[in-house]
C-alpha cells in the first residue's frame, strides 16, 4: 500500500454524526482529526488575533467568514505537513475549498446524507458543554448525570439553533453552501456519499473505504 500521506475531508449537516465518524476514523486509521470548531474555540480562549476576529461573528450568531476561517485552518495545516489528516468543518464553502486546493490535493471526501426527520430528532436531543465543545445525545451518548458534563461537572446547555424550529433553516443553509463544494469533489472523483439514519450502519462502509487507502491500526470492531 502506498505510503503517500492521506488528506481526507468529511462533509455533513449539523447532527449528521460527523464527530462520531471522525473519532472512529482517527482511532482506526491514526489520522489526525482536525476540527475547525475545536481550533476556533482554542484561538478564542487564547485571545489570538484570528480568535478575536472570529469571536465578533460568533457572538452575533453569524457564520465566521471565509477569510477568517481559511487563515486559521491554513496555519493549522501548515503545522501538520507530515501527517495524515481528516478535516471536519472545513472546507464549508467553495471559496474555502479553493483555498485548500492551493496547499494540498484532497484524496478522499465523505459526505453524510441523513434524512431531515432524523437530524431534527438528533439535534433536539443534543446537549453541549460550551467551554470544551463536548457533545452529548440523550439517546446514544448521554452524560453520566443528566444535564452535567462528565469531565468537569459543569452544566450542559442546549443551543438555540438545535431547537426544532431552527433546524430546518440550518439544514437549508447547509445545503445551499455545501452544494458547490460537493459538486467540486464529485467532479474530481474523490467524493463518496453515505446515506442512512444510523452511524453504526454507515461505519462498515466508511471503514472499507479508508482501508483501501491506508492500513488500519486496529480492527473495525473497535468503536
Swiss-Prot record:
Any coiled-coil regions, as ranges: none
Chain sites annotated for binding AMP: 36, 41, 62-64, 89-92, 96, 170
EC annotation from Swiss-Prot or TrEMBL: 2.7.4.4, 2.7.4.6
Residues modified to N6-acetyllysine: 175, 179, 186
N6-succinyllysine sites (modified residues): 60, 179, 186
Entry annotated with the keyword Mitochondrion: yes
Region (NMP): 35-64
Alphabetized PROSITE patterns for the sequence: ADENYLATE_KINASE
NCBIfam families: adk
Role of this protein: Broad-specificity mitochondrial nucleoside phosphate kinase involved in cellular nucleotide homeostasis by catalyzing nucleoside-phosphate interconversions. Similar to other adenylate kinases, preferentially catalyzes the phosphorylation of the nucleoside monophosphate AMP with ATP as phosphate donor to produce ADP. Phosphorylates only AMP when using GTP as phosphate donor. In vitro, can also catalyze the phosphorylation of CMP, dAMP and dCMP and use GTP as an alternate phosphate donor.
HAMAP family, per database record: Adenylate_kinase_Adk, Adenylate_kinase_AK3, Adenylate_kinase_AK4
Name of the protein in its database record: Adenylate kinase 4, mitochondrial
Gene: AK4
Amino acid at each position: 500500500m502506498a505510503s503517500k500521506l492521506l488528506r481526507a475531508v468529511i462533509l455533513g449537516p449539523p447532527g449528521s454524526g460527523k464527530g462520531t465518524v471522525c473519532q472512529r476514523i482517527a482511532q482506526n486509521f491514526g489520522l489526525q482529526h482536525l476540527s475547525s470548531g475545536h481550533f476556533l474555540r482554542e484561538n478564542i480562549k487564547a485571545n489570538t488575533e484570528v480568535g478575536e476576529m472570529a469571536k465578533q461573528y460568533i457572538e452575533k450568531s453569524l457564520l465566521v467568514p471565509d477569510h477568517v476561517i481559511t487563515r486559521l485552518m491554513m496555519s493549522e495545516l501548515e503545522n501538520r505537513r507530515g501527517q495524515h489528516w481528516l478535516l471536519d468543518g472545513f472546507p464549508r464553502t467553495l471559496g474555502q475549498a479553493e483555498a485548500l486546493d492551493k496547499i494540498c490535493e484532497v484524496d478522499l471526501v465523505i459526505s453524510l446524507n441523513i434524512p431531515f426527520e432524523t437530524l431534527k430528532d438528533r439535534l433536539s436531543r443534543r446537549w453541549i458543554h460550551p467551554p470544551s465543545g463536548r457533545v452529548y445525545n440523550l439517546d446514544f451518548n448521554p452524560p453520566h448525570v443528566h444535564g452535567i458534563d462528565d469531565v468537569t461537572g459543569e452544566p450542559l446547555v442546549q443551543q438555540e439553533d438545535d431547537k426544532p424550529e431552527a433546524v430546518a433553516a440550518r439544514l437549508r443553509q447547509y445545503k445551499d453552501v455545501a452544494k458547490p463544494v460537493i459538486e467540486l469533489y464529485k467532479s474530481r472523483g474523490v467524493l463518496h456519499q453515505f446515506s442512512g439514519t444510523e452511524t453504526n450502519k454507515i461505519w462498515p462502509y466508511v471503514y472499507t473505504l479508508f482501508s483501501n487507502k491506508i492500513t488500519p491500526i486496529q480492527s473495525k470492531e473497535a468503536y
